[in-house]
Amino acid sequence: VNARVGKWSLNGAVSGTFTPRDKGEMNSNREYGTVGNKFVSQSLYDTDSKYGNGRVGAIFEIDSLNSVGAEIEYINQASDGTSWSQTDLVKNSYPMKSTGNYRQKDDYNTFSATVNYLRKMDERGSIFKVIADFVNKRSTGDNLHTIRYEQSNWSRDTVYRSHAAADYDMATTDISFQKNLRKKMSLKIGAKYTYTLMDDHSLYEGLNSSGSWIPNEEYG
């Protein structure tokens, strides 16, 4: 959407993608030529994802030589999925079974803002500009895994989860001047400052026999 109201030029846009849930089933069966050997596997999955974007901006013409503008934008992308699998294996008439449940959730967000000032210096198109930008990005991911192994005389459970997050901030200021001397000849000077901050952290935990979550420092 674009609009002109007096000295204001306005623009905005919104978009989104919402996909149907992705569900599926996979089955595998292997036949052996010998008695007492078998392999059967089944998997189920269910995934949901979405994407959204919004942007709005404005430019104000102070006079014929000076103008200021600003724009902000937000983006979100997320997915959430579960899966289940079971495998039955018989080797030399000795049965073994494994069952797994998995959950994964991811979220990604971006916010950006821009402010600028422009001044036309002469009729040749010489211009003085000041532009300031800020971008914030944040992503998170969570996983939960439950696995069970079974044989004829024993069984074992494994449960673990993880959380990962990343934060990223960047701010820039750009000041420039372009002097058009004559056709196809110009002089450009300027300065730019950039500030960056990054924070990445993750946590991996396993569930012990008493029901407590124990951090795994080797992966964290």
Task: Put a short name on every predicted segment.
Residues 1-84, 102-140, 171, 176-196:
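Membrane-proximal, glycine/serine-rich, low-complexity loop/turn segments characteristic
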Residues 160-220:
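Outer-membrane beta-barrel transmembrane domain signature of Gram-negative proteins
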Residues 43-45, 91, 104-108, 151-153, ...:
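Short linear motifs at secondary-structure transitions and domain/linker junctions
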